[in-house]
């Protein structure tokens, strides 16, 4: 019985020992599975990994991993690793320009300069293909895509070889024009005004009411209305015939007559205004001489009378003259065909609208070479530097800028420049 009890006790001890060993194995195995790097020091400690922007200075072994930060614009590390050191940044060479700088956690991103694209097979920058005359742009040349062109379909044309302009719609002649040349894929249609087409007028029938001029002197209308009404009456008198003017020679001979009549009307109007002002000043001077010394000046808003029978409020006359002078100053300020004559607010608006790479396309249309365009990228505001450089040229006219904007399909900027009127006439 004692031997049987001893044997059972030994078996229990053996089972307990196996159970303990199994538990220890499971615990050690679980500890190793939680190590993300899968590497351990000689003492069994899990090796730590270096974060993004850090590289391994001393690998894990006898001691724990030693990390060091990468240097901005010199080295980078874009992986979490216990073995990878910081890698040197990529340099953009030749026809490449940097679109994203090298930082501690990301490498530099290079792209081909304006007018070039990166060939996927060779990796080199190749010149963008040019759409020839009669072909237009479908997809622009950028990054890893070359220019995609198409032959201009019917109703469109392209008369320039470049890699930025699509096929343009053909010009349609108006009813008052005749077509000299049809539109082809490589040339636009050409139109010409039809000469000798005049508006015919019929004489009024007998017995109709005819307005007779009034003997009373009417109130002087504004200058622009007086000129328009006088010219309209003159043209009606000369052209008021029931027979249309058919011969071209007669129409050409009447043009000097119209010009002479218009000049006479303008001279007469100027003389009339000068006489009225001189007469008014003369009466004011006579009134000042005959007024007593202690007489107070007329209050604001008093009516001024002249021999013409016209009653004018002095305050309204002063406000109208001030408004006229202000409008004239605005007209003089806004006049001019140079880009530098634009108001500062308009130039700043153009700079804001030229976002992205649009200013590069505009620079190419204004005649700048790719090397010169790249030099603007070193400025704080490349768009402002481009427009300032171009605006200093004698040929920097507003018409040239509008034409270049139309060629790069930026009609919104053209509309913004043309929307604001320079001045308004006083009423």
UniProtKB/Swiss-Prot annotation:
This is Tumor necrosis factor receptor superfamily member 16. Residues 356-421 form the Death domain. Induction: Expression oscillates in a circadian manner in the suprachiasmatic nucleus (SCN) of the brain and in liver. Expression seen at higher levels during the light period and lower during the dark period. Low affinity neurotrophin receptor which can bind to mature NGF, BDNF, NTF3, and NTF4. Forms a heterodimeric receptor with SORCS2 that binds the precursor forms of NGF (proNGF), BDNF (proBDNF) and NTF3 (proNT3) with high affinity, and has much lower affinity for mature NGF and BDNF. Plays an important role in differentiation and survival of specific neuronal populations during development. Can mediate cell survival as well as cell death of neural cells. (Microbial infection) Cell surface receptor for rabies virus glycoprotein Gs. Residues 197-223, 284-334 are annotated as: Disordered. It is found in: Cell membrane; Cytoplasm; Perikaryon; Cell projection, Growth cone. Its main location: membrane. Pfam families: Death (PF00531), TNFR_16_TM (PF18422), TNFR_c6 (PF00020). The death domain mediates interaction with RANBP9. It also mediates interaction with ARHGDIA and RIPK2. The extracellular domain is responsible for interaction with NTRK1. N-glycosylated. O-glycosylated. It is a single-pass type I membrane protein. Glycans are attached at residue 63. Residues 32-254 are extracellular. One of its GO terms (molecular function) is calmodulin binding. Disulfide bonds join 35-46, 47-60, 50-67, 70-86, 89-102, 92-110, 112-125, 128-141, 131-149, 152-167, 170-183, 173-191. Residues 200-217, 284-294, 308-329 have a biased composition (Polar residues). Residues 276-427 are cytoplasmic. Keywords: Apoptosis, Biological rhythms, Cell membrane, Cell projection, Cytoplasm, Developmental protein, Differentiation, Disulfide bond, Glycoprotein, Membrane, Neurogenesis, Phosphoprotein, Receptor, Repeat, Signal, Synapse, Transmembrane, Transmembrane helix. The gene is Ngfr. Residues 1-31 form the signal peptide. Detected in Schwann cells. Detected in embryonic brain, in hippocampus neurons (at protein level). Detected in brain and spinal cord. TNFR-Cys repeats lie at residues 34-67, 69-110, 111-149, 151-191.
């Amino acid at each position: 019985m004692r031997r049987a009890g001893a044997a059972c006790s030994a078996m229990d001890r053996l089972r307990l020992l196996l159970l303990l060993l199994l538990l220890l194995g499971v615990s050690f195995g679980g500890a190793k599975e939680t190590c993300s790097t899968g590497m351990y020091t000689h003492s069994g400690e899990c090796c730590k990994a270096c974060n993004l922007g850090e590289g391994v200075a001393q690998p894990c072994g006898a001691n724990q991993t030693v990390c060091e930060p990468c240097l901005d614009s010199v080295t980078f590390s874009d992986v979490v690793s216990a073995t990878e050191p910081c890698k040197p940044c990529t340099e953009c060479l030749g026809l490449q320009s940097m679109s994203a700088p090298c930082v501690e956690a990301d490498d530099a991103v290079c792209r081909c300069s304006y007018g070039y694209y990166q060939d996927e097979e060779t990796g080199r920058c190749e010149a963008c293909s040019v759409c020839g005359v009669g072909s237009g742009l479908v997809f622009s040349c950028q990054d890893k895509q070359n220019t995609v062109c198409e032959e201009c379909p019917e109703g469109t044309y392209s008369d320039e070889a470049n890699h930025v302009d699509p096929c343009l719609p053909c010009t349609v002649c108006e009813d008052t024009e005749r077509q000299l040349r049809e539109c082809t894929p490589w040339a636009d249609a050409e139109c010409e005004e039809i000469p000798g087409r005049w508006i015919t007028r019929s004489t009024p029938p007998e017995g109709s009411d005819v307005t007779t001029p009034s003997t009373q002197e009417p109130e002087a209308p504004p200058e622009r209305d007086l000129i328009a009404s006088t010219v309209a009456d003159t043209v009606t008198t000369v052209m008021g015939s029931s027979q249309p003017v058919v011969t071209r020679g007669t129409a050409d001979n009447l043009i000097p007559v119209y010009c002479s009549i218009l000049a006479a009307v303008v001279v007469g109007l100027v003389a009339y205004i000068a006489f009225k002002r001189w007469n008014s000043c003369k009466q004011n001077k006579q009134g000042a001489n005959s007024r007593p010394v202690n007489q107070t000046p007329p209050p604001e808003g008093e009516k001024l009378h002249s021999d013409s029978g016209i009653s004018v409020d002095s305050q309204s006359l002063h406000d109208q003259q001030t408004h006229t002078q202000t409008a004239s100053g605005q007209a003089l300020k806004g006049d001019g065909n140079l880009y530098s004559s634009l108001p500062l607010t308009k130039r700043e608006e153009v700079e804001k609208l030229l976002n992205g790479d649009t200013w590069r396309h505009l620079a190419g249309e204004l005649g700048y070479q790719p090397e010169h365009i790249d030099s603007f990228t070193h400025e704080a505001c490349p768009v402002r530097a481009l427009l300032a450089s171009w605006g200093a040229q004698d040929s920097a006219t507003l018409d040239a800028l509008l034409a270049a904007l139309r060629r790069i399909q930026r009609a919104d900027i053209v509309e913004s420049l043309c929307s604001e009127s320079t001045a308004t006439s006083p009423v």
